Regions:
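Phosphate-binding and adjacent anionic-ligand microenvironments
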Residues: 34-189
């Protein structure tokens, strides 16, 4: 299925299960990393640990980027990544495509994967560990207040000596997972 302007694709497996974009990125990474010299794969701060773990396991180089279509598109090119994407489903192929997001092209790459592996969609994710996540929670705010709140959370995390990544809001890294608090770039939400 494609979104309204055709720049994203949603993948549904043969069992009727929706495949999130970061899982689709695992499928593509499994195809690209073993066969290309450039093994850099870009992902945004909302993607799961399963993706970064798989990129690393395959010998690839995970490259973290802030969330946002314009950021990930530019960073995929500027960081010289063969492939990049974000949790919202914008995907950028640079191995044999121009590097912009096209739902149609991403869908065709899925068809290509199915054809050359002769596997079912669900089988393309075999061996990926199950990580549990909460759905995105949006808290209404004002544009001014949302920035203040994220800054206060950053300050708290520093005071508590948490390991953080502050590329986009504050992502607290833990041994068995992470938590992210960021403000929306497109609306008055945290």
């Amino acid at each position: 299925a494609f979104d309204g302007d055709g720049d994203r694709v949603g993948i549904i497996d043969e069992k009727g299960t929706y495949i999130p974009a970061d899982k689709f990125m695992i499928m593509i990474s499994r195809d690209l990393i073993p066969t290309h010299e450039n093994k850099r794969i870009l992902y945004d701060v909302k993607c799961s640990k399963a993706l970064t773990d798989e990129i690393t396991r395959l010998g690839g180089v995970p490259v973290l980027c802030r969330t946002g279509n314009s950021y990930t598109k530019l960073a995929t090119r500027d960081e010289n990544c063969i492939f990049g994407g974000e949790f919202s489903g914008h995907l950028y192929f640079r191995d044999k495509f121009l590097g912009f997001d096209s739902g149609m092209y991403a869908g065709l790459r899925m068809v290509e994967l199915l054809s050359k592996t002769n596997k079912k969609t669900s089988e393309l994710l075999e061996g990926v560990p199950k990580y549990y996540s909460t759905p995105e929670i949006k808290i209404p705010s004002t544009d001014t207040k949302k920035k203040e709140v994220v800054e206060k959370i950053k300050e708290y995390c520093h005071n508590e000596h948490f390991h953080t990544i502050e590329l986009d809001g504050v992502r607290v890294e833990m041994e068995d997972g992470w938590a992210l608090v960021r403000f929306s770039n497109t609306g008055p939400n945290i």
